Amino acid sequence: MTQVSVPQNDAVVLSTVRILAGKKGSPPSSVGTGFFYRADNGNITNSRVVIMTNKHVVEGSDYINFTITSSNNLYEMGKGGQPANRNDLTHHVDIIRNISPEIDNYFPHPSDEIDLCAIDISSIFMSRLQNSLKVRAHLIDSNDLMTEDEEVTVAHVEQIMVCGYPTGLWDSTNNMPISRVGHTATNMLTDFNGKREFLVDMPIFGGSSGSPVFRYEVPMYKTSASNLSLGGRIKLAGIIWGTLNKTQYGEIKIIEVPTGEKPMAAYQTNLSLGIAHPASTIKELASIIGNRINEVQSCEPNLIKR
């Protein structure tokens, strides 16, 4: 496997993917965000490459389209960290549900209260490699999750980075997402109002559904509750799924982040608070996928690592 080292904050940005979803025979009708994740059964050489996103991003859709950037040489980087002779190719993947464990490529989180799913795209990565191309991507995996020692240092307010495609906006020339830095509004490890979610102090718009939330400790990170070390540490903290709005009657409404051209009622005011499921829910879904690894061909692509 060929890997190219890039700065950590650049690597995690390369984990995102812009998702277009639609019905069979029709053009895409919704847009959302996903991120590449490598799920394995304890053996990193025997893994699946999936796109993690929200269930509501692909609900009612028969397929997704997304663009992957690849090159025959990731070592030759131009301005902005773009590989020389890069090739952007849009891929079409049919969503296969409830056929058989050997055929299905759609993995929903088993809880109806968790808006999280994964779509297996291992074959797409393999096809790129078979053409002697290397993928400009960072696959998030268990190494990007916080350890128990790192969780001990989590405070109520932490700096975070959210990468995605608000209102579908993206850098289409370079196939790059929009990245923003903000803070948590509630503790990322504590269930908000008894539900497995936390709040982020950041405006969340349509198209942001499925955006990864990273604990963004730059330029210093905590080694304990009271000690800091120079350097950076970025860990997956969760995934965006909703936002909080206020009605003209003063009621606070929780809504899924819209994925299509659905106008929001004028009497609703966005509170600039997003809702995210914690990384533990992603870990659970990855474990479910890992338990089925031996049923499919393994995939270990050439990647950018951090």
Q: What role is predicted for each listed range?
A:
Residues 6-9, 37-39:
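Long protein-protein interaction modules used by eukaryotic assembly/scaffold proteins
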